[in-house]
């Protein structure tokens, strides 16, 4: 009974977000023709290909975001972001309707807390990814640079909660946890040994042109008899930053 009452109380606290007074529709469409010439220096010879390509620089998307003021400096809101292939119209992110981000948040003088599907701290994705600016290419070009530079495993996760502190002296601290990172590809139970779980702490420092990022994250892989049973739990430490000189950024 206590669990039921607690769940009702949480839902009631966030119910106002469904009637957000300020809703924004946004999107990106990246579509063009792509020509490639490949010569592997084998008996097969060179190949040429001309095709329509979606998302060469930035993934096509559309989204909705809204905010409702509750008073006393507290507000609730949501972000719903869909990914799709612009050349076919097909849904992306394993056929999810809002696969790029689906979050409900509350923020105020205490900081910000959000729930749902979101980018992990050690990614450049969504509202809470911290490390996208560590690469000069960010998350563009299909995220290929992002994936090989500072990130291991999933870049967006289901069943996730994140807390962001207020900013003090340029510092902001983050904590994130996913009870089951990807529910579409495995028969799992949240917070149990047969689910892939994620823990992370992160911090940013911003002072004018100087931006610093640090994260520590851990993957607690499925320990059941599933496909992940041979994987050791992972631990990643990421440090980086940038400085904007005006004419160039390093």
Q: Where in the sequence are the language-model features?
A:
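Outer-membrane beta-barrel proteins
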Residues: 1-250
């Amino acid at each position: 009974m206590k669990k039921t009452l607690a769940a009702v109380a949480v839902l009631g606290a966030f119910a106002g977000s469904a009637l957000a007074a300020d809703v924004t529709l946004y999107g990106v469409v990246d579509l063009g023709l792509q020509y490639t010439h490949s010569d592997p220096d084998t008996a097969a010879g060179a190949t040429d290909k001309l095709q329509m390509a979606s998302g060469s620089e930035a993934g096509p998307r559309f989204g909705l975001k809204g905010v409702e003021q509750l008073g006393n400096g507290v507000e609730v809101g949501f972000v719903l972001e869909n990914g799709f292939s612009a050349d076919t119209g097909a849904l992306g992110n394993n056929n999810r309707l809002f696969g790029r981000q689906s979050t409900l948040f509350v923020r105020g003088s205490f900081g910000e807390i959000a729930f749902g599907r979101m980018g992990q701290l050690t990614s450049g994705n969504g509202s809470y990814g911290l490390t996208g600016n560590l690469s000069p290419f960010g998350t563009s070009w299909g995220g290929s640079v992002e994936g090989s530079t500072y990130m291991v495993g999933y870049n967006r996760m289901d069943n996730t909660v994140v807390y962001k502190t207020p900013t003090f002296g340029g510092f902001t601290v983050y904590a994130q946890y996913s009870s089951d990172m990807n529910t579409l590809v495995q028969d799992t139970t949240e917070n149990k040994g047969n689910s892939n779980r994620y823990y992370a702490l992160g911090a940013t420092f911003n002072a004018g042109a100087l931006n610093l990022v640090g994260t520590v994250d851990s993957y607690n892989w499925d320990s059941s008899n599933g496909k992940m049973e041979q994987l050791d739990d992972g631990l990643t430490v990421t440090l980086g930053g940038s400085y904007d000189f005006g004419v160039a950024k390093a």
